[in-house]
Amino acid sequence: MGSRPRSPSAFPAPWWGQQPGGPGPAKRLRLEEPAGPEPRVAPSLEDPAGTPAVGALTSIVVLAAGCALRVPLDDVDLVLELPPTSILRVSLDGHTLILIPEVLLSSVDERSGAQDDSSAGLEVDVFLGALREDVVVEQEVFCASVPEIAAQEEAYEEDADPEFPELQMDSAAGSAAGLYSSARSMFSPYREGPIPEPCALAPNPSSEGHSPGPFFDPEFRLLEPVPSSPLQPLPPSPRVGSPGPHAHPPLPKRPPCKARRRLFQE
């Protein structure tokens, strides 16, 4: 039988388009799309070495001998117990628990013999080993610093003990009395003879048992010329009323002037 020609349309389909037995592009796209999201594998206790999720929180718990860890969940309470020679790793929703017996921490040989979870055991050993080294170093530094400080303080006290009586004696004598007593033989360039010694101050009642020794040597002379110095002291100034070697002879008394005689008539 002959085929009837189709009526022309606004958008005629090309003759090389869809084949009668082949699928269309839309159906092919539907077949290539995944049927649905793949179900995620729920974490379980049977797979302790599984890779933890990104951003999961990891906690390390050290259990003493004969103790267990109780983890409260939504409906039940999970009780975790482990043998004293193994390390248990539990993965929950976004939280990873690593349980370590206390016996393994006390012996390096027992920690190295644990084969249940080698990766977790290495991480825990490195972490706890570094922490233990820090604690030991702090204790050694603290214990060593205490005797050194005590020995230094004792040495300071022994060195300072002989100096304390001298300081007390000097302070009891009084700085003013010591300075005044050292000026008993001081000479002045403007007067002849030494300066008279000033009166001594009243003794301090607290210094009766100490000897008020002067601070300076009483034989010390101030303002004495130095032999090697070109500067020499000035000669003493002449006293008023005493004729010097270069004194001028007294002038004769003159009669008062005429104006003075008129003003002051005798």
Swiss-Prot record:
Annotated stretches, region: Disordered: 1-47, 197-266
Residue spans of biased composition, Basic residues class: 255-266
Superkingdom per UniProt: Eukaryota
InterPro entries: PRR23 (IPR018903)
Low complexity composition bias: residue spans: 1-18
Comp. bias regions, Pro residues: 227-238
UniProt family annotation: Belongs to the PRR23 family.
PANTHER family registered for this protein in UniProt: PROLINE-RICH PROTEIN 23A, PROLINE-RICH PROTEIN 23B
Name of the protein this chain belongs to: Proline-rich protein 23A
Organism, as annotated: Homo sapiens (Human)
